Amino acid sequence: MTKVKICGITTVADAMMAVEAGADALGFVFYDQSPRNLEPAQAAEIIRVLPPFVQVVGLFVHAPLDFINTVTDRCRLDVVQLHGDEPQEFCAAVNRRVIKAFRIKDITSLDHMDEYNVAGYLLDAWSPKAFGGTGVTFNWDTALIAKKFGPIILAGGLTPENVAEAVHYVSPYGVDVSSGVEAAHRVKDPEKVRQFIQRAKECLGSM
């Protein structure tokens, strides 16, 4: 069954709603240029009240290693998601399992993926304006090729309307959504979250 991560969590209410809807993981953004950015203290307060067995993921972009490792300990993160140009050596120095994000323009965006030895690979649409959360899709054929490198988490423009098609076509390890289930910036829509998770988990992949 496909795993589902709801990213850009900013409140206890949204966190608990996503968990109750069946989310496997919650994402917290530690990037001050994102509209979904949280201070570590804010995230820690939300994470503290989560039930067990929910994976907590911290998203970072070009952050100093010391900052990442400090936040992982303070917030008790399970996984770190790196969205910048961090090399394998940097990933290896992070004190948690790492998901490395690749922003996909075309097939050449996978050229350096074989240099990484990480827990998973997140594929998102390339944008000149943002590192994720853009609501833009990319050619899913690229994701099929990327599966040979390890567990693939599909992101980029996913919504309740297209997630079943994406899962059926790519059969990824997981899917990741942020803007696609929002009612407004920083606010999740409960019905969209419920539909997204239900459709992602009910669909059987083709591969």
Swiss-Prot record:
<dbReference type="GO" id="GO:0000162">
    <property type="term" value="P:L-tryptophan biosynthetic process"/>
</dbReference>
<dbReference type="InterPro" id="IPR013785">
    <property type="entry name" value="Aldolase_TIM"/>
</dbReference>
<protein>
    <recommendedName>
        <fullName>N-(5'-phosphoribosyl)anthranilate isomerase</fullName>
        <ecNumber>5.3.1.24</ecNumber>
    </recommendedName>
</protein>
<keyword id="KW-0028">Amino-acid biosynthesis</keyword>
<dbReference type="InterPro" id="IPR001240">
    <property type="entry name" value="PRAI_dom"/>
</dbReference>
<keyword id="KW-0413">Isomerase</keyword>
<dbReference type="GO" id="GO:0004640">
    <property type="term" value="F:phosphoribosylanthranilate isomerase activity"/>
</dbReference>
<dbReference type="InterPro" id="IPR044643">
    <property type="entry name" value="TrpF_fam"/>
</dbReference>
<keyword id="KW-0822">Tryptophan biosynthesis</keyword>
<comment type="similarity">
    <text>Belongs to the TrpF family.</text>
</comment>
<dbReference type="Pfam" id="PF00697">
    <property type="entry name" value="PRAI"/>
</dbReference>
<keyword id="KW-0057">Aromatic amino acid biosynthesis</keyword>
<comment type="pathway">
    <text>Amino-acid biosynthesis; L-tryptophan biosynthesis; L-tryptophan from chorismate: step 3/5.</text>
</comment>
<dbReference type="InterPro" id="IPR011060">
    <property type="entry name" value="RibuloseP-bd_barrel"/>
</dbReference>
